[in-house]
Amino acid sequence: MLYLSEENKSVSTPCPPDKIIFDAERGEYICSETGEVLEDKIIDQGPEWRAFTPEEKEKRSRVGGPLNNTIHDRGLSTLIDWKDKDAMGRTLDPKRRLEALRWRKWQIRARIQSSIDRNLAQAMNELERIGNLLNLPKSVKDEAALIYRKAVEKGLVRGRSIESVVAAAIYAACRRMKLARTLDEIAQYTKANRKEVARCYRLLLRELDVSVPVSDPKDYVTRIANLLGLSGAVMKTAAEIIDKAKGSGLTAGKDPAGLAAAAIYIASLLHDERRTQKEIAQVAGVTEVTVRNRYKELTQELKISIPTQ
């Protein structure tokens, strides 16, 4: 098969560069005008297999998957399968099965030897568990894993519970990736209490110099509205209310989730898609008192008139 090659530009020849072609089967550079073989015995550095799509290329590649920060050893080690079958797919006899069990035990011990390995293995399992419960995307879990690894390298986990530091790393990752999750939402899935997670979060920001953007109440609007089954019109109105509140300086020092919840409550009343303060507060992860206070502030300061039933 003949095709143009970028590498042919390095071949010193009077043949015009755009006339040089490469014969992959013969390993030769040829001038298409004169038929002269410019260079031969070229070693093909590419794979011996063919792939026509990126998916086929990835499937046929033998170099393994990319590094995975959510695995304690980043996925670099090998695993002995638990299927108890040989290379031909045949079930192992009882004697071989016991041998495979012993190999697995020793292989696991070899993978997790140091105290740091054991710490990371436990932490990454906890991170995966919380991430799945919160339905977090892989990018956020990867970011949380990186933050936790930095904390381990700096010795910040020593003397603190792994669960609280993992939860704090997840919250920091959500903030960095602008994913609307409150500290209460994350803390409810850990053995640590909210106060401990918040303390670890502040520690990570201070010691690791992790920069997080200021939370925007509008980031919470879509998620809360979707969970409540509200329309796009309600979301749009809630976002407009938040923009007006920002312009009036009402958002400074306020919990963004509480502001978003109050804005959605007002918008749902304006569009006659009524939800109770209790329903909205539960979904937003705030108290009814917070929703009620923010509701009063927004309606009074922005002079929003709520229609009566």
From Swiss-Prot:
GO terms for cellular component: transcription preinitiation complex. Sequence repeats lie at residues 125-208, 219-300. GO terms for biological process: DNA-templated transcription initiation; transcription preinitiation complex assembly. It comes from the Archaea. InterPro entries: Cyclin-like_dom (IPR013763), Cyclin-like_sf (IPR036915), TFIIB (IPR000812), TFIIB_arc (IPR023484), TFIIB_CS (IPR023486), TFIIB_cyclin (IPR013150), Znf_TFIIB (IPR013137). It holds the Pfam family Zn_Ribbon_TF. GO terms for molecular function: DNA-binding transcription factor activity; TBP-class protein binding. Transmembrane segments: none annotated. Keywords: Repeat, Transcription, Transcription regulation. NCBIfam families: PRK00423.1. Stabilizes TBP binding to an archaeal box-A promoter. Also responsible for recruiting RNA polymerase II to the pre-initiation complex (DNA-TBP-TFIIB). Belongs to the TFIIB family. This is Transcription initiation factor IIB 1. It comes from Saccharolobus solfataricus (strain ATCC 35092 / DSM 1617 / JCM 11322 / P2). The gene is tfbA.
